[in-house]
Amino acid sequence: MTFPEADILLKSGECAGQTMLDTMEAPGHSRQLLLQLNNQRTKGFLCDVIIVVQNALFRAHKNVLAASSAYLKSLVVHDNLLNLDHDMVSPAVFRLVLDFIYTGRLTDSVEAAAAAAVAPGAEPSLGAVLAAASYLQIPDLVALCKKRLKRHGKYCHLRGGGSGGGGYAPYGRPGRGLRAATPVIQACYSSPAGPPPPPAAEPPSGPDAAVNTHCAELYASGPGPAASLCAPERRCSPLCGLDLSKKSPPGSSVPERPLSERELPPRPDSPPGAGPAVYKEPSLALPPLPPLPFQKLEEAVPTPDPFRGSGGSPGPEPPGRPDGSSLLYRWMKHEPGLGSYGDELVRDRGSPGERLEERGGDPAASPGGPPLGLVPPPRYPGSLDGPGTGADGDDYKSSSEETGSSEDPSPPGGHLEGYPCPHLAYGEPESFGDNLYVCIPCGKGFPSSEQLNAHVEAHVEEEEALYGRAEAAEVAAGAAGLGPPFGGGGDKVTGAPGGLGELLRPYRCASCDKSYKDPATLRQHEKTHWLTRPYPCTICGKKFTQRGTMTRHMRSHLGLKPFACDACGMRFTRQYRLTEHMRIHSGEKPYECQVCGGKFAQQRNLISHMKMHAVGGAAGAAGALAGLGGLPGVPGPDGKGKLDFPEGVFAVARLTAEQLSLKQQDKAAAAELLAQTTHFLHDPKVALESLYPLAKFTAELGLSPDKAAEVLSQGAHLAAGPDSRTIDRFSPT
């Protein structure tokens, strides 16, 4: 039996429920969610993965990368630090790919560069993005790039290679007329609106070439004449890609005034006389702006910088404007092949900035110099000491210009360094603070690691000046057969412990036995022995023999803790730390005290516990840890640790082994247990403390108490002697 009224109410309820669900839907929820995630990425908030491309570092979220790229999904499962092949994707291209993942669109500057005519031999930006998207397996980006390239009729040219006139060289191979040291140089033009001109074999005419400021990345045209300039990218943030290079690039050239489609009033914290911040409006369609003159890429002779009002400058700089290097130095990015300052890790002394610091001068104190908090001392010629020559008169040249892995900085005429987005000069990114790098011996702080290294080298020179004559006298005396001066062996390890050299230089190098008076100077010296280690840390410069060791070392800099406890969520940087922590949850205590029977989860806790027993006798503590490697004792000539035992312990142990005819493994057990008991035999007040190890000794060896007492009584008188000796671990054989 049915009730029509009930059916009507049920249907009306379903309709009302459907209407309620429709009203709860937020059409722009997914877009807002991506926008919030992108904001968190730019601020480094809750980022759980770091992608390293060349010398640039990018923070991101694992879930977002795994949902967008099948290739990245397979990587983020296993590690929190990813290294991408820089032959397949460059830092500038990966920045665009990461922006697409978080926003769903490519920037206008890339589309304009792909739509504009490019010089023969140069590769289009959109083609590089397509190659990177294919490598990272991002199908949406691949489809978008192919669609845009087909629209402009350039997809077939990419397939055909660079053999034809107007075609483009494949990604990763330099075109004709380009040097191999600049594999990622791209052309960028400003024609956001209007039909693109057809590609021609002849490059655009003009007296100069063009430089584009693309979020602290450099995009320079080929060696041909000029093109026009592309506006900076809108969403520029240095947090998207942080530079891990040890050395900073030069800030010797800066445009007279940033080109912009729309100007904003200067920021309140802007330096006096600085230009306004700029950004690009999406709806604007302006004609191409006139190019700026600059040094040609192929010109190897350094000349005065045209951007600083000298040589061919369009005009002098406005008075009161700060030096361009002081504004742009910190935020210049390293593009592969454009001044590979990131590849150098241990710099020989001799650059102008280092010599200035070694002489005791402060860069902030020099008149007309950049402020200390913003710019380190310039390391390139042509910035302070004149064009092309350092402080000691040596010319700076690129050591491997044609291979792309230069060890030394290139001259200003050889490579052009990048310019950041204009608002980066006003200090908008997060503040890292001043003087974070502190010299341990003197406590002086510096804003950059290269200034600290130069300062430490000044300590080395000062030390050599103070003790150079003493070392020379020692060498001369040793050659004459008179022995080292001061009668104490100088500062060698074999000298007397109380020698003058031992007191003045207590820190020694394990490789060459050189000694220094502070650990910071010793670490600086140890870097000279790292030449055979091919894997350097791009943050501190330390080198390693294996890539895995370098990756684990970088976790300490980046704050990565990939090993997490499943029980409590606590994270660790090393696997063995997690193993020790898991014993807290499992209750496992593998380390046992052989004196009192106490058990511990970690070996360091047992060592601390044995120090308590060492108050009554140091021999008992050392013997209890004989099976665990022993306490750290006095190292001998072979580098092995020694243990201090009373003289009678070895006599009793050897006597016990001979009379009981023990096996090899039983002899070691007898030596350990006797070392724990015999030092108590001469003191009747503490005789009860020996009951536990003695009972354990008899139980393990299967001896009766009478037999054990008889053996111990024969050697007990030897244990009463106060003398002790330091020998190797006891071996009954």
Swiss-Prot record:
Ranges of Pro residues composition bias in the record: 193-206, 368-380
Function noted in UniProt: Transcriptional repressor. Recognizes and binds to the consensus sequence '5-[CG]NG[CG]GGGCA[CA]CC-3'. May act as a tumor suppressor. Involved in development of head, face, limbs and ventral body wall. Involved in down-regulation of SIRT1 and thereby is involved in regulation of p53/TP53-dependent apoptotic DNA-damage responses. The specific target gene promoter association seems to be depend on corepressors, such as CTBP1 or CTBP2 and MTA1.
The BTB domain, residue ranges: 47-110
Family statement drawn from the similarity comment of this UniProt entry: Belongs to the krueppel C2H2-type zinc-finger protein family. Hic subfamily.
Crosslink position(s): Glycyl lysine isopeptide (Lys-Gly) (interchain with G-Cter in SUMO): 333
Region spans: Mediates HDAC-dependent transcriptional repression: 154-315
Alphabetized SMART domains for the sequence: BTB, ZnF_C2H2
Species name: Mus musculus
Region (Disordered): 189-209, 241-421
Stored PANTHER family: HYPERMETHYLATED IN CANCER 1 PROTEIN, ZINC FINGER PROTEIN
Disrupted-gene phenotype: Impaired development resulting in embryonic and perinatal lethality. Serious developmental anomalies including acrania, exencephaly, cleft palate, omphalocele and limb abnormalities. Mice disrupted in the germ line for only one allele of Hic1 develop many different spontaneous malignant tumors, including a predominance of epithelial cancers in males and lymphomas and sarcomas in females. The complete loss of Hic1 function in the heterozygous mice seems to involve dense methylation of the promoter of the remaining wild-type allele.
TM spans (from-to): none
Assigned keywords, A-Z: Acetylation, Developmental protein, DNA-binding, Isopeptide bond, Metal-binding, Methylation, Nucleus, Phosphoprotein, Repeat, Repressor, Transcription, Transcription regulation, Ubl conjugation, Wnt signaling pathway, Zinc, Zinc-finger
Main location: nucleus
Region of interest (Interaction with CTBP1), ranges: 241-247
UniProt domain comment: The BTB domain inhibits the binding to a single consensus binding site, but mediates cooperative binding to multiple binding sites.
Positions where N6-acetyllysine occurs in the chain: 333
Residue list for modification Omega-N-methylarginine: 159
Subunit structure: Self-associates. Interacts with HIC2. Interacts with CTBP1 and CTBP2. Interacts with TCF7L2 and ARID1A. Interacts with MTA1 and MBD3; indicative for an association with the NuRD complex. Interacts with SIRT1.
Disulfide bonds: none
Gene Ontology MF term list: DNA-binding transcription factor activity; DNA-binding transcription repressor activity, RNA polymerase II-specific; histone deacetylase binding; sequence-specific DNA binding; sequence-specific double-stranded DNA binding; zinc ion binding
Residues where Phosphoserine is found: 237, 248, 366, 704
Protein name: Hypermethylated in cancer 1 protein
Any one of the GO CC terms: chromatin
Post-translational modification: Acetylated on several residues, including Lys-333. Lys-333 is deacetylated by SIRT1.
GO biological processes: intrinsic apoptotic signaling pathway in response to DNA damage; negative regulation of transcription by RNA polymerase II; negative regulation of Wnt signaling pathway; positive regulation of DNA damage response, signal transduction by p53 class mediator; Wnt signaling pathway
Tissues expressing the protein: Ubiquitously expressed with highest levels in heart and lung.
